[in-house]
């Protein structure tokens, strides 16, 4: 069964405390969403993960995650982001969201997607990359994610982060770990509620991925945390992770869980949209 552990941390020291041995030991992949932290500052964190385990990093316009300090799911957006398109702009902040996948059932790569056997792909790509054409050729399951400022993978032998165009974390077809996805531009609770209503019997939500356009959040609502709060109201106690995007990758509509629709018809690159994916786990 896939286990997802995630947290929004205020600084590198808090991130290191979260990435303790009992969290990263035996993990399958670690993903870091960073706002306001250069890659070099995160090398000590990446070194805590076993050399054979992929560690990916996204340099973000903003981040979404569960903050122990705030006791809730929150969002942070870089100062002024969105004013270039007429928005009020983000009000600043720094943070790091760590997402650690363990227990088997996921594969991660930068060059290829599984030719078969996957039920969903999380995709993070550098804005301006050719990720859309790549997905059109290789995706065999629906995808969710978005475009960041930059994407990196950690190179253990060289102790550095290497810039890459994109990375993927694919969930494999394991019965205990269904994944569902939808997209919305309005009615957050309605969209997420519809997806929840399709969750397989005997399952519970384990984590929620949230990938909104950076023209949403404060630029859409005038205040922060509207969408994280709406998700939390429906799924109390469930952690959220993700980032604000400059182009959102995901379904055109609600796909339910473990959809078998061809992603070339069911998914696309969006704008001014929020993508939601719910990871479910067996309730037993």
Predicted regions and their residues:
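Hydrophobic alpha/beta core scaffold segments
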Residues: 1-284
């Amino acid at each position: 069964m896939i286990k997802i552990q995630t947290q929004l941390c205020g600084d590198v020291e808090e991130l290191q405390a979260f990435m303790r041995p009992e969290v990263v030991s035996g993990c399958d992949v670690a993903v870091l969403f960073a706002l306001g932290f250069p890659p070099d500052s995160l090398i000590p964190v990446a070194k805590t993960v076993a050399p054979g385990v992929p560690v990916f990093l996204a340099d973000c316009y903003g981040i979404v995650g569960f903050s122990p300090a705030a006791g809730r799911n929150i969002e942070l957006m870089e100062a002024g982001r969105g004013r270039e398109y007429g928005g009020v702009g983000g009000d600043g902040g720094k943070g790091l969201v760590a997402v650690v996948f363990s227990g088997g059932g996921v594969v991660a790569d930068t060059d290829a997607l599984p030719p078969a056997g996957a039920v969903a792909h999380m995709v993070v790509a550098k804005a301006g990359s050719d990720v859309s054409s790549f997905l059109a050729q290789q995706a065999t399951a629906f995808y969710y994610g978005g475009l960041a400022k930059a994407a990196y993978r950690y190179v253990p032998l060289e102790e550095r982060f290497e810039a890459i165009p994109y990375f993927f974390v694919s969930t494999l077809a394991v019965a205990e770990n269904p994944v569902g996805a939808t997209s919305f531009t309005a009615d957050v609770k309605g969209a997420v509620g519809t997806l929840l209503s399709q969750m397989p019997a005997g399952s519970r939500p384990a984590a929620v991925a949230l990938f909104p356009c950076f023209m949403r959040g404060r630029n859409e609502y005038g205040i922060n945390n509207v969408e994280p709060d709406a998700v939390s109201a429906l799924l109390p106690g469930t952690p959220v992770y993700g980032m604000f995007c400059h182009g959102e990758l995901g379904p055109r509509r609600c796909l339910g869980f473990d959809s078998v629709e061809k992603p070339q018809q069911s998914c696309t690159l969006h704008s001014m949209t929020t993508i939601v994916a719910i990871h479910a786990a067996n309730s037993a």
